[in-house]
């Protein structure tokens, strides 16, 4: 994989319907044991790489895990989400805190937001590629760091993205109506 490779080419942009990908994204907890072609994985990773970040800091590193034994170990550190071990690929999203913009909103580091943007684009690209993404957000950071030899202190595990083909369709998430979440001119 080349650094300068354009993962989202003109032909893909023409066929991409972002709204369709948003609608078809579902939490899937059962994966087929079918390998993911390298081109599809690179499309997902390339989309994550293109995510915006505060001051273009790009504080992310993505660890790709395919080894079945390692996936089992990681799943055991994910608080009851053992099904992720059945996904052909786990993408472990790590943030290097020192590389993130330090004062988002003048009170916090940008890395949680930066990583969330990368995760969102990765999920949408996965849907576009016919893959089922599952965002793992409950895990023991220290155990994951130990298993994957991630440096402690300045690097945090922010998410694990399980990728595969859905064995069965996930249930749609309930969504609040716009009237419940949108305010005009002021909060109240």
Predicted regions and their residues:
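Glycine/small-residue-rich phosphate/adenosyl-binding loop
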Residues: 40, 46, 50-118
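Short secondary-structure boundary segments
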Residues: 95, 138-139, 165
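A glycine-rich helix N-cap at a beta->alpha junction
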Residues: 82-87, 150-172
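C-terminal helix-cap and adjacent tail motif
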Residues: 2-14, 18-37, 159-188
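Small-aliphatic-rich amphipathic alpha-helix that forms the alpha element of a beta-alpha
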Residues: 48-49, 91, 106-148
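Short active-site-adjacent structural elements
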Residues: 100-101, 143-145, 168-172
């Amino acid at each position: 994989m080349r650094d300068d490779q354009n993962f989202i080419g003109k032909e893909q942009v023409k066929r991409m319907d972002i709204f369709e990908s948003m609608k078809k994204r579902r939490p899937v907890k059962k994966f087929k044991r079918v390998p993911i072609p390298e081109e599809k994985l690179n499309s997902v990773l390339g989309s994550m790489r293109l995510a915006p970040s505060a001051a273009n800091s790009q504080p992310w590193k993505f660890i790709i895990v395919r080894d079945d034994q390692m996936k089992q170990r990681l799943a055991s550190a994910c608080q009851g989400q053992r099904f992720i071990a059945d996904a052909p690929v786990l993408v472990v999203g790590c943030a290097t805190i020192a590389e993130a913009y330090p004062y988002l909103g003048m009170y916090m580091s940008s890395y949680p937001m930066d990583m969330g943007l990368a995760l969102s684009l990765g999920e949408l690209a996965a849907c576009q590629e016919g893959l089922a993404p599952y965002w793992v957000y409950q895990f023991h950071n220290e155990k994951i760091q130990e298993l994957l030899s991630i440096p402690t202190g300045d690097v945090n595990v922010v998410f694990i993205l399980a990728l595969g083909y859905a064995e069965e369709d996930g249930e749609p998430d309930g969504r609040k109506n716009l009237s419940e979440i949108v305010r005009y001119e002021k909060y109240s």
